[in-house]
Structures are given as C-alpha cells and as structure tokens.
Amino acid sequence: MGTIYGANASLVSKDNTYGIALYQSYRNRNPYDADGDGFSELGKLNMNTFGLRTYYRPTQFSRISLEYHTTNEFRRGGNKFDLEPFETDITEQTKHVINSGGLSYDIFWKEYKHKLSFYSSVQHTDRNSYYGAQQNPDAYGKTKDLTWVVGGMYVGNFEKVLFSPATFTAGMEYQNNSLHDIMLGYHRDMKQDVRIAGGFVQNEWKMNRFILLAGFRVDSHNLIDNPIFSPRVNLLYKPTDKFQARLTWSTGFRAPQAYDEDLHVTAVGGEGVLIKLADGLKPEHSNSFSGSVDWTANIGHWQTNLLLEAFYTGLDDVFVLEKIGQDEQGNTVKERRNGNGARVYGVNLDGKLAHGRDVALQVGFTVQRSRYTKYENWSEDENVKPTKFMPRTPDYYGYFTLTSAPFKNFDMSVSGVYTGRMHVPHLAPDFSVIPENYEYSYIRKDELVHTPDFFDLNLKLNYTFVLNDHIKLQLNGGVQNLFNAFQKDLDKGGFRDSGYFYGPTQPRTYFIGVKITN
C-alpha cells in the first residue's frame, strides 16, 4: 500500500523576461513481504522532494538561471518494523537529506551565433544509516558527501571551418568531491577527496549529406597518475529526410574510487558483507563503437519508424567483485579489484507505428552479450567455478508501449518490459554461526544462479473531465505488473542473503489517481 502526491506550478512573464517553475512531491510506501517469512522484499519508503527553477534575462542576449532541489528520504527493509533497528533480526535503513543547487549565466552575440556560458553547482548529502543483523547495536553509520562543480563553455557557429560550416564547442570544468563515511561497528572510517580538472573540445561540420563531429576530453584526476585522454568521433549520413545512418566511436573511464554501492552493507547469514578497494586499483577504461540506420516512412495515414543499431564496448582493467574472506569481526569482505577485461556487444531494434492520436505502438528488443575476456573468480570457495558471465546482465531484453485515444477525453496505455535470463551471485551463510534448526533452509555453498526470464505488463486508463475553459480533472487507474512476475526462490529468515534479489522490483500493484491541471 502506498500513496503519491505531487504538485507543480509555473509562471512566465508576458515578455519572457523572467520565469519560475516549482514542484513538490510526497511518496509513502509500506513494506511488502512476498513469501510470508516476516522479512520484507520491498522496504518501507517515505520521501519528500521540493525544487524550483527560475531564470531572468537582464538583456535580450543574456540569461541567468538558478535552481534548487531538496530531498528528504527514509528507507527501511528487514523485519520487526515496530522496533528499533538494533532490536531486529535484519535491518537495512537509511535516511538521506540531500540539498543541491545550481547557477548559470549565458551570454549570446551576433544574432545568437555565439554563446558563452558559466555554470556552478553544489550538492550536499547527509546520510544516517543502519546495516545490521542479529540485534547488532553497533551497526549505525553516518555519511557526509559534498560535491561542487564550476565550469565554462563556449559555442560558436561559423560559416566555414576548413571545408564546411561548423559548430565549435570548447570548455573547462573543475569538480571536487569530499566524502566521509563512518561505521564504527564495522571499523570503517573512510575519507575520500576526489578532484578532477577537465577540458573538452569538439567541432561539428555540417555538409550536404554528412555531419561529422570530432572532439576529445582531457581529465586530470588526483587518484590517477596520468591525465586521461578521451576522444570521440561521430559521422552521420543523411541522404534524405526519411533515412539516416550513423557511426560512432567514443572512449571513457571509471576512476579507482569508492562509489555509492561500495558504502552499502548487505547481510548474509546474519553477518555484514563489506566492500573494500584493492590496493593499487587501476582505472577501468572503455572503448565503444556503434553503428545505426534510421528509416522513417508514411504509409497511407500511418507514420512508421525503424531503428537498427549494433554496438560493441571493450572494457580494460574491468572492475570485478570477489569474495576474499572475513575480517576480524567475522564480516564477509568483498574486494573490488581489476579483472582482465570484458566485452559488451549486441544488436538493438526499435520500431514505431502511429496513426495520429488514435493509436501508437513502440517496440524495442536487444540481443546482448556481456562477457569477461577470461574467467574471473567471484567466490573465495575453491569448489565454486569462476565465470565469464558478467553478473546481472541479461542476454535478451525488450519493451513495448501501446497508447490509444479511441474517443474524446479517454485514453489508455499498455506497456511491458521483458527481462531475459541472467546470472546472479547467491552467497551461502557461514554455518558455524547458524542455529542447527536453520541449517537446511539455506544453500550449502555459493552459487551463480541462472535466473528465469520475466515479463512485466502494465495497464493504465485515463478519463479527463473539462470543468471549464481552463481547468481539467483527470481520473486514472490501472495495474502494474499484471501477471505478478516476481522472484520465486527468495531466501527466507534472518540468515538470508539480503542481496540475492533479481527481476521486477514491484509485485502486482493496483492504483488510482486524480490529476488537476490548469
């Protein structure tokens, strides 16, 4: 059971000199226990958000923009929700207070052919957490995270650069992140300061049938010895308005730093599972290629579009997680280390078919392979085989959306998401700490489970009442996950692997709503 409330408003002056938009939302969700064991599969959630965006034009050729967003979020999963976390068998609880804002100044000249932008943003996150099991009184934690960014960018449109008209873009950016995460019960007091100075240049040439974009970015990261050079090239061929083909090459990297998922502590067998970074962890580099053809046609009163895309990404020094043992407190430790490499490649097909507002259908399907180049260990158990499969990456996935407005004031939509089979790690508990009557409730050793596939179908109906010329009242209702496609082999009880969860995150859910617009 849950509720969602939301409101937004906007105001723009008649001469477009200034404007402001505000939004606010509230969401509440009760915990959901799918298998009746007293432990939630879907946690309790309370969230408030508020934000605003505003702009002011001092002159015809300048613009100042300001935005502010705040989120207050409480999440809790586990059991015995009426008790304090340290009185339960398992609790994963976080409370986030996030405040962020941004300020930018844009100036144009020569009939908007040139633009100079300066921008800055800041985000502060204050998080209080509890990740513990078996009435652990010391599993509380606190995290403070501050990120700020400043930068500038120039965009210029020129009649000719070398051989054709072009749009030139260049900019510089500095980013600073300070993170302090304390969990004394797990003997973790981590401080991380990340400083990144970057610059980028690109040029887009526009010819009769071709558009060529070439550029690069250089980043200096304080946790990486040498600057990272990341080039990219994009070539678009468009002989007609109804057909185009594109080739793209790009590069990127992930720095050897702690990310948000590294601060999360799951529970297996009543003990915590921590993630640590390996000594000498190197950055992960990516090299991506893609090609696509896009065809549009009108067949009678029908509009059609077909997109076929092939993609390939090579990852070097790919980040992998391996279970390496236990710390002095008996908590399982996973280490983020560099693997040999990985390859992600496949084909994607998207199609659209529409007949005005009467009916529109969009369908997409992807065939993908995500494999390590060599077998990688993921468990400390020597009897568990290493794998080439990248975890939690299906080989097949797709979606469809069908919308229709068969008569005035009524419209409907049917949508679905297909998720193919994937390999998901399932960790066994330490049986030396489990009571004898629980021993046969859990797997005996770590397993890489080949999951079933899922089809998540959703239905929504809308009817709009026109109250007067300016106010409309919409009533809507429907069902999400109509077939209740949900994981069947959930771990049960207080010694379960709380990270063993896959597939749709929401069970069959009925909803009704009211929307008023002016």
What label would you give each PLM region?
Residues 7-9, 16, 22, 117-131, ...:
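Membrane-embedded beta-barrel scaffold of Gram-negative outer-membrane proteins
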Residues 29-49, 57-114, 122-145:
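Flexible loop and strand-edge segments within Gram-negative outer membrane beta-barrel domains
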Residues 206, 305-306, 310-314, 335-429, ...:
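Gram-negative outer-membrane beta-barrel transporters
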Residues 94-98, 122, 126-130, 135-212, ...:
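Outer-membrane beta-barrel transmembrane domain signature of Gram-negative proteins
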Residues 59, 163-167, 187-314, 366, ...:
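Structural signature of Gram-negative outer-membrane beta-barrels, strongest in the C-terminal barrel
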Residues 316, 418-436, 463-518:
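C-terminal beta-signal and adjacent terminal beta-strands/loops
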Residues 15-34, 117-130, 167-175, 190-232, ...:
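Surface-exposed extracellular loop regions of Gram-negative outer-membrane beta-barrel proteins
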Residues 1-36, 43-50, 470:
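Outer-membrane beta-barrel translocator/receptor signature
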